[in-house]
Amino acid sequence: MKKLLSVLLCAVMVLSLAACGKKENAPTPGPDPNGETEGLTVALVVAGKLGDRSVYDSSKEGLDRMVADLGVTPIVIECNNENHDIQMKNAAEKANIVVCVGWEFYNVETIAPDYPEVNWIWVDNATSAPVSNVLNITYAQNEGSFLAGYIAAAVSETGVVGAVGGEDADTINDFIVGYTQGAEYYGTENGKEISVVKNYSNTYDDPAVGKDCAIALNDQGADVIFQIASACGDGVFEAAKEKGFYAIGVDSDQKYIDPEVIICSMKKEVGSSIYDAVKSYLAGDSRFGTTWTADMATGYVGIGYGDSGMTQQVPDEVKAAVEELAAKIASGEIVVETTRA
């Protein structure tokens, strides 16, 4: 069945090229953009489990949009933080495109070549060298976190802001270095002494641990705390409500969870980025074999403040300053530090 499906898709591609002609140096063509997606299956494989109200849920929203707008057949696989390689292979046996969400799928570099008829999208990390059927999508979370740090420092009354990371790893620390730089930028700009404290939950799915981490930072004086720990962030929000400090959400606009304590969120538009990648592929603009950095200039990272009906703790003048900073980051006028090469 899978071989038949591949043959049919190839036939569509050949007919499309015959009708339109082939340009020199054109991107690798995909299926016809005019609705020829019947039978195209996209598998979403998440390293943890859905319900994180963050990256995984955002990726599922992107898949849902593909179903509604592009007519693909969806498969969803939750790894629950184990058996990542097995689940990648299971997905490849059933799908034409496999979207792997999480840095844990590093073996895609060796597994993808064994399934050359399948295209892969790896979210939140990149292969060490290009793989012809793998599109890496990395996010400039350091840039968005710079803005979050600036906001934290602007709102803080103690001059101490904090961050709870899921683990001491490059991806998480990329958030923290940007957050720290943004907080210090505000301090320098406004003559205010700012300190940044941090700790790590060393898990992503235990809100009780996240709560303990947040309380420990609050005990050090932090009155605004950035959660970068997936579902552990629920514990950070709970601690904020109990102890009377503010929190910043991550990856998705999380203000709706508790608008009274969550002042903003650092957003990574994971769902939109994978949707756009698949849509571009279907239109004949393939990026497989490359790494795509979704940065401030692309609009895939930024700040969310919830909707206008929610309590807004961030002053309008600070929001205006954040917009100016975002433009400077996008243009390269401000270069944000990173843990990534």
Language-model features: locations:
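A residue-level marker of the well-folded mature domains of exported/periplasmic proteins
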Residues: 22-341
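Positively charged n-region of N-terminal signal peptides that target proteins for export
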Residues: 1-9
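C-terminal motif of bacterial Sec signal peptides marking the signal peptidase cleavage site
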Residues: 16-19
